[in-house]
Amino acid sequence: MQFIDQANIILKAGKGGNGIVSFRREKFVPAGGPSGGNGGRGGSVILIADNNLQTLLDFKFKREIIAKDGCKGGPNKRSGASGEDTILKVPCGTEIRDIKTGIILGDLTKHKESLTIAIGGRGGHGNAYYLSNQNRAPESFTEGKDGEIWEVQLELKLLAEVGIIGLPNAGKSTLISVLSSARPKIANYPFTTLIPNLGVVRKIDGNGCLFADIPGLISGAADGVGLGHDFLRHIQRTKILLHLIDSIAENPLHDFEIIEQELQKYGKGLLDKERIIVLNKMELVDDDYLKIITKKLEDLSKRKVLVISSSLKKGLSSLLSEVWKRI
């Protein structure tokens, strides 16, 4: 399934039904009173969060959503039927923003949480509404009101508790595949991962914790370079970031600094998040070098650095223990 995490759509609520002019036509009642009914309310457009959805793909080609109009009133003071509401299901974690003003209209983070965006127009009044002592046979009526029109941007921000970040080829996909049942594409070249991968990791108590493998960031990602800018939003909701560093990289210290700089430039509190620094691929370097680079990373980051091998599944218990302590 294609991963789409942003969509611009137009939401049009239904028009209210018109009121009508009608008079009672009954046997032996030659001059019946006004009986024109009111029009029905126009349908509204309502967004509902659904845990079963992971993408905004449904809105890639469906850019205009229109709710049903209300029906006109009927004789004998019958009100017209209301227009059916249009229900749009979106993934949990979808933020809705008004394109014209930039104002956030809502943020649907819980299953079945709903938000009414475009409200249907009110139905018009039939002539029975205008009956008065001064006017016993009114012929006035009103048309239904137009429904609201909103142009909004839907933006999906994944609800993972733990985000795995790092430069391309740091081993993020391998790590999430051994920690969970996720099966991302894994290969020994940069940008294998083109979309965020999600995996549920079980805690000791049996409860699940959602991890997200974020596609490789590169220098300039916060400014739109490479793939990273498109996916940095997905770590905004995480509680912890696992910063994975390739121990066989030409300069692991420089790699660490690149990601830190991108988090700082992107802003939105990313640099303030709890971070665990993880040196991966320990099996590919000798012990002396590993000790040296670990010490330098700890001095640079002012944090404890964990050393692991995703492919050999070494050091993962210590890593998860550290994660559980911080959630």
Curated annotation (Swiss-Prot):
Obg domain span: 1-159
GO BP annotations, alphabetical order: ribosome biogenesis
Localization: Cytoplasm
Keyword field: ATP-binding, Cytoplasm, GTP-binding, Hydrolase, Magnesium, Metal-binding, Nucleotide-binding
Cited SUPFAM superfamilies: Obg GTP-binding protein N-terminal domain (SSF82051), P-loop containing nucleoside triphosphate hydrolases (SSF52540)
Essential cofactor(s): Mg(2+)
Its biological purpose: An essential GTPase which binds GTP, GDP and possibly (p)ppGpp with moderate affinity, with high nucleotide exchange rates and a fairly low GTP hydrolysis rate. Plays a role in control of the cell cycle, stress response, ribosome biogenesis and in those bacteria that undergo differentiation, in morphogenesis control.
Protein name: GTPase Obg
